[in-house]
């Protein structure tokens, strides 16, 4: 085992606890926001102690600077600008920027791939037609 | 999954709890929901909406898991920081 690495079952409990805490934070936010900020802090402590990544669905739900829980529409605004998603925390005014260049690239790649596969299928059809119809297709 | 076997390592916040026995008589029999945890205390929101801070070390707690099982735990097994409890070794007192 690597130095400082925890056994698998501990990491599993840590992951479960992080998920429970964030869900509690989400539920408590409307009634007691200070509790949800506290739960975020506890979840982050667990994540740091056991070097577990905070799941993707919760990573954008707390402020990177003041670590308060964020609920879009209540204490945070989400805007898209310059190829980034901007989360503005209303507790401290910090702006978190998440670029979505990877998704953009994927979309571009899919576009190109869909073109090429379409041409490929076209070719296959012509090849099949060529086999059937003889030389009339290949002359073109 | 919170089971009776790993409950003292798992998240206590959100569970419903009853104080079964305590050195301090006034807090004995209190029931409610855990809303916060520190190294030495649990903060319990009682059924009438009041919050009370209870030291872990002096009481025996009855927790109810989300599956509905009742678990009795000596508070002395819980005395540790919330994030440290996962790796805490449990000794029968």
Curated annotation (Swiss-Prot), chain A:
InterPro entries: RNP4, Rpr2/Snm1/Rpp21. Keywords: Cytoplasm, Endonuclease, Hydrolase, Metal-binding, Nuclease, tRNA processing, Zinc. GO terms for cellular component: cytoplasm; ribonuclease P complex. It is an enzyme of class 3 (hydrolase). It holds the Pfam family Rpr2. It is found in: Cytoplasm. Its cofactor is Zn(2+). Induction: Constitutively expressed (at protein level). Residues 111-121 have a biased composition (Basic and acidic residues). It comes from the Archaea. One of its GO terms (molecular function) is zinc ion binding. Zn(2+) binds at residues 63, 66, 89, 92. Its main location: cytoplasm. Its EC number is 3.1.26.5. Consists of a catalytic RNA component and at least 4-5 protein subunits. PANTHER family: RIBONUCLEASE P PROTEIN SUBUNIT P21, RIBONUCLEASE P SUBUNIT P21. Part of ribonuclease P, a protein complex that generates mature tRNA molecules by cleaving their 5'-ends. This is Ribonuclease P protein component 4. It comes from Methanothermobacter thermautotrophicus (strain ATCC 29096 / DSM 1053 / JCM 10044 / NBRC 100330 / Delta H). The gene is rnp4.
From Swiss-Prot, chain B:
The keyword Cytoplasm applies. It catalyses: Endonucleolytic cleavage of RNA, removing 5'-extranucleotides from tRNA precursor. Disulfide bonds: none annotated. Keywords: Cytoplasm, Endonuclease, Hydrolase, Nuclease, tRNA processing. InterPro entries: RNase_P/MRP_Rpp29_sf, RNP1, Rof/RNase_P-like, Rpp29/RNP1. It is found in: Cytoplasm. GO terms for cellular component: cytoplasm; ribonuclease P complex. The keyword Cytoplasm applies. Induction: Constitutively expressed (at protein level). Its EC number is 3.1.26.5. GO terms for biological process: tRNA 5'-leader removal. Pfam families: RNase_P-MRP_p29 (PF01868). GO terms for molecular function: ribonuclease P activity; RNA binding. It is an enzyme of class 3 (hydrolase). Part of ribonuclease P, a protein complex that generates mature tRNA molecules by cleaving their 5'-ends. NCBIfam families: RNaseP1Mthb (NF046110). Belongs to the eukaryotic/archaeal RNase P protein component 1 family. Consists of a catalytic RNA component and at least 4-5 protein subunits. This is Ribonuclease P protein component 1. The gene is rnp1.
């Amino acid at each position: 085992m690597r130095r400082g690495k925890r056994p698998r079952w501990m990491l599993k409990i840590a992951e479960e606890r992080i998920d429970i805490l964030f869900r509690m934070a989400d539920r408590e936010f409307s009634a007691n926001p200070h509790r949800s900020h506290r739960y975020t802090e506890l979840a982050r402590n667990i994540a740091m102690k056991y070097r577990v990544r905070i799941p993707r669905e919760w990573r954008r739900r707390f402020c990177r600077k003041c670590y308060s829980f964020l609920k879009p529409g209540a204490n945070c605004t989400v805007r898209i600008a310059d190829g980034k998603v901007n989360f503005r925390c209303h507790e401290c005014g910090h702006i978190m920027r998440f670029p979505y260049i990877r998704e953009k690239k994927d979309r571009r790649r899919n576009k190109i791939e869909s073109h090429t596969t379409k041409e490929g299928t076209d070719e296959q059809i012509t090849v099949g037609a060529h086999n059937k119809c003889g030389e009339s297709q290949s002359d073109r | 999954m919170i089971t009776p076997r790993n409950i003292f390592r798992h998240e206590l916040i959100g569970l419903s709890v009853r104080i079964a026995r305590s050195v301090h008589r006034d807090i004995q029999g209190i029931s409610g929901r855990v809303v916060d945890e520190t190294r030495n205390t649990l903060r319990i929101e009682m059924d009438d909406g009041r919050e009370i801070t209870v030291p872990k070390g002096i009481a025996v707690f009855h927790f109810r898991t989300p599956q509905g099982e009742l678990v009795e735990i000596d508070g002395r097994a819980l005395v540790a920081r919330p994030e440290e409890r996962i790796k805490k070794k449990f000794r029968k007192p």
